Amino acid sequence: ALILKNNFGTEVLKKCNDNNVSVLALKCMAYELWESDDRGEFQKCWYKPLSDKDFIEMAIKFTLSQNVVSFLPPGNERLFKLAIELVNNDLKKINDDEIKFLKDQSKHINPIGSSEEVHI
């Protein structure tokens, strides 16, 4: 959502691409900020992570389409294992319908940062 809703980091990604610099992505499975202190099974996450497998797969595919060589999944063991499972299952390239879905979803959430932030 940070890139799709707030254009966060696109300048850095472009500069890295132009200079052949590898990028490690953080928070690619972040959904939004918590609205309450009830974090259920995600006690280790300061943000609400994606939990739907298909949504996570699209988020990972989108992330890896942005000149990113790797990413760090959330600190939740189940989500960490799911991310590894997904990347080990021959991820296909993200398609236009999936990008549209992610853009539509990003309109309705409170992302974990904004385009003005320097540190998240």
Language model feature labels by segment:
Residues A1-I120:
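Beta/alpha (TIM)-barrel catalytic core signal, keyed to glycine-rich beta->alpha loops juxtaposed to Asp/Glu
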